[in-house]
Design a protein with these regions (language model features):
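Catalytic cores of nucleotide-sugar-dependent glycosyltransferases that transfer UDP/GDP/TDP-activated
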Residues: 1-472
Length: 472
């Protein structure tokens, strides 16, 4: 089985969100299983391994009425072959997205993915495209390449990491920039706009999301950002596969960022030492209180409005809070002020610090993740890995990965409705459970034993790839 994984970002080369983690981990897990999985992505200006790249060739890529240069470079990393597509006009910029011509940039990239195959001795069985930045790959394949021998058996899978970002532009972009004539514009047109993601829904052989629950949620108008009717029509080719995490990078036994390494065998001593160090760092009291933590972007979608509503109530219960993140000014201001008002009980760090994030995973007792919507989420899995039971809302991948321990065997605490009352109730249950030390230690051990490795998810993808390759 030959897989070409097309993504606009991949760790460790370029990252703005969870897509990069998936693109950096899933192909590696597939290769370990004997799949010939390769990654293709843009060569951004910030990529640091240019001295390790091998130049392959260069060629022209159609972009509307003109052609643009594309350079092809190759590298091996962790056993995976990476192809980097170079065009300094489009990709040598500070940052990955947010430019006025993003539609043109990723129309070029999508077309270049297919043009690149003419210059490789590698023809994939499946091209796995990801999010709107590669959504035009199956569109272009069906319109301009399917009749060619090299392409006529290639199948496509489109993975939705977050349906909120669809690649929506004015209709004038289609012919002039994307090179899609008026006869075919209906494939990409939706609700009076050019919608790249809609084009992938129409033309890809399969559609996946990053968790089974999210695959069901996006059929509902509340979660779909306007695409629910189309997705219900395409439901026959939609499925959800839960993401995994890199178990080596997130390993409390070897993590150099934390003050005391530990495993299931000695988590009591390890967690206690990491908690004490975390409390010292944030000036919190060491009085036996549980520490509840958040590591997240400070936006409403992550449930910060709920946390804001109950924060003082949690502190009054005797819970200490640690918050790491940045985002909307109203939340940055509130939690900074909360730390000032409740010294010794609340610690806030505005910004992001990866080492500190790992220290929080290791040192906290519970991890808060009350998201309004969460396609998959990785933080709750990392928290389990470090023996920090999560408190999550039952949505998307949170529902698929965390089971409520108060209902029997579970690895955390859950609540269903998006309300401050239900979050507060879940926190109270967690707080009460914390003081039952024997059962709490069983919960921590159970959470640490959960297998969220990519090897599990890779098996599901391999099944999907085989099924898709055998279509017609």
């Amino acid at each position: 089985m030959r897989i070409l994984y097309a993504a606009s970002e991949a760790t460790p080369f370029a990252k703005s969100g969870g897509l990069a983690d998936v693109a950096g981990s899933l192909p590696k897990a597939l290769v370990r299983d004997g799949v010939d999985a390769r990654v293709i992505m843009p060569l951004y200006g910030d990529i640091q391994i240019r001295d390790q790249l091998t130049y392959v060739t260069n060629y022209s890529v159609p972009v509307g009425w003109r052609s643009q240069y594309c350079g092809l470079f190759r590298a091996q990393w962790d056993g995976v072959t990476y192809y980097f597509l170079d065009n300094e006009y489009y990709f040598k910029r500070r940052g990955l997205y947010g430019f006025y011509d993003d539609g043109e940039r990723f129309a070029f990239f999508s077309r270049a993915v297919l043009e690149t195959l003419f210059y490789l001795d590698f023809t994939p069985d499946i091209i796995n495209c990801n999010d709107w930045q590669t959504a035009l790959v199956p569109v272009y394949l069906n319109l301009y390449y399917r009749h060619l021998d090299k392409f006529n058996r290639i199948k496509t899978i489109f993975t939705i990491h977050n349906i909120a970002y669809q690649g929506k532009y004015g209709l004038d972009i289609l012919e002039d920039t994307c090179g899609i004539g008026r006869r075919d514009q209906h494939i990409v047109e939706y609700d009076g706009c050019a919608n790249f993601m809609k084009g992938a829904f129409e033309t890809a052989d399969k559609i996946t999301t990053v968790s089974p629950t999210y695959a069901q949620e996006i059929l509902d108008p509340w979660f779909s950002y306007g695409l629910d009717a189309l997705l219900r029509e395409k439901q026959y080719k939609l499925c959800g596969i839960l993401n995994g995490i890199d178990m080596d990078a997130n390993n409390p036994a070897t993590d150099p960022s934390i003050p005391y390494n530990y495993s299931i065998a000695n988590f009591r001593e390890g967690k206690a030492a990491c908690k004490a160090a975390l409390q010292d760092q944030f000036g919190l009291h060491k009085d036996g209180s549980p520490v509840f933590a958040i590591v997240s972007r400070m936006v409403g979608m992550k449930g910060f409005d709920l946390v804001q509503s109950i924060a003082d109530g949690l502190v009054d219960l005797g819970i200490e809070l640690v918050i790491l993140g940045s985002g909307e000014s109203q939340y940055e201001g509130f939690f900074s002020d909360l730390a000032a008002r409740r010294p010794g009980r609340v610690g806030t760090y505005i910004g992001f610090n990866s080492a500190l994030a790992q220290q929080i995973y290791a040192g906290a007792d519970c991890f808060l993740m009350p998201s309004k919507s969460e396609p998959c989420g990785l933080a709750q899995m990392v928290a389990c890995r470090y023996g920090t039971p999560p408190i999550v809302r039952e949505t998307g991948g949170l529902r698929d990965s965390i089971q409520d321990s108060t209902k029997g065997h579970g690895n955390g605490f859950t609540f269903a409705g998006y309300s401050a009352h239900e979050l507060y109730d879940a926190c109270c249950r967690a707080n009460a459970a914390y003081y039952d030390k024997e059962n709490w230690e069983h919960l921590v051990e159970y959470a640490m034993n959960c297998d969220f490795s990519w090897s599990v998810s890779a098996k599901s993808y391999e099944g999907l790839y085989n099924e898709t390759a055998n279509l017609w």
